[in-house]
């Protein structure tokens, strides 16, 4: 088994059970038919030197950004994303609507923050016109129930749940 993890965690894993592949920010790797670009996220890690990561996936046909545990985007990540167009954005949406003042806003996105970023992604051509935004990492205390949230949201938003599969 190969474990692909942020490089500061690599020394914490017992290597006799795994092959360790330390991931470095902005250094693309290949796993099977996928190219994956780790990007820095805006979140506090557990280790002093840790850089929490978002991931941009490519396979020659589609690409998507997977970004949980992070809020807004770091400028260095934005500069890289501007060079790409992707088919889907899977994003941390810990905080729902009407929770202004919640302390988690410095490490996790709120739905209003995502709406602002989404407008920019579409306007700048980073998200394709038909691209979905999948909301994940939702705090159950900061959102209505699944059905209520889905009813409130239209394209481009989908609400993830345990076992959710999104076909691009």
Regions found by a protein language model. Give the residues of each.
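Short, well-ordered, mixed-charge alpha-helical segments that flank or form enzyme active sites
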Residues: 1, 45-47, 142-143
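Short secondary-structure boundary/capping segments
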Residues: 12, 27-28, 56, 124-125, ...
């Amino acid at each position: 088994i190969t474990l692909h993890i942020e490089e500061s965690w690599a020394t914490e894993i017992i290597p006799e059970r795994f092959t360790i592949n330390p991931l470095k920010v902005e250094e693309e790797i290949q796993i099977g038919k996928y190219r994956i670009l780790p990007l820095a996220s805006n979140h506090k890690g557990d280790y002093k030197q840790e850089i929490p990561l978002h991931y941009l996936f490519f396979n020659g046909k589609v690409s998507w950004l997977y970004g949980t545990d992070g809020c807004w985007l770091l400028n260095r990540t934005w500069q890289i994303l501007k060079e790409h167009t992707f088919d889907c954005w899977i994003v941390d949406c810990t905080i729902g609507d009407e929770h202004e003042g919640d302390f988690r806003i410095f490490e996790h996105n709120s739905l209003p923050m995502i709406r602002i970023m989404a407008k920019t992604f579409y306007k700048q051509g980073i998200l394709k016109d038909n691209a979905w935004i999948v909301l994940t990492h939702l705090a159950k205390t900061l959102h209505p129930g699944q059905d209520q949230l889905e009813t409130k949201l239209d394209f481009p938003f989908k609400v993830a749940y345990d076992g959710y599969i999104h076909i691009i």
